[in-house]
């Protein structure tokens, strides 16, 4: 079987609420850490989410 080129990652809110999204990313095309503006329902605003590893 072929080895998967995608890693599971956790995008955690920088607002300090503990809210997170999970997604996958291609580790060859995007080796740097992701940072995306997404909606945080706990503060009801768009905030930056940064990539962390899933434990």
From Swiss-Prot:
SUPFAM superfamilies: Zn-binding ribosomal proteins. One of its GO terms (biological process) is translation. This is Large ribosomal subunit protein bL33. The keyword Nucleotidyltransferase does not apply. It comes from Janthinobacterium sp. (strain Marseille). Keywords: Ribonucleoprotein, Ribosomal protein. One of its GO terms (cellular component) is cytosolic large ribosomal subunit. Residues 1-11 have a biased composition (Basic and acidic residues).
């Amino acid at each position: 079987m072929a080895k998967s080129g995608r890693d599971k990652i956790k995008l955690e809110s920088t607002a300090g609420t503990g809210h997170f999204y999970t997604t996958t990313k291609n580790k060859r095309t995007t080796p740097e850490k992701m940072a995306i503006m997404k909606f945080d329902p706990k503060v009801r605003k768009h905030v930056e989410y940064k990539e962390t590893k899933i434990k």
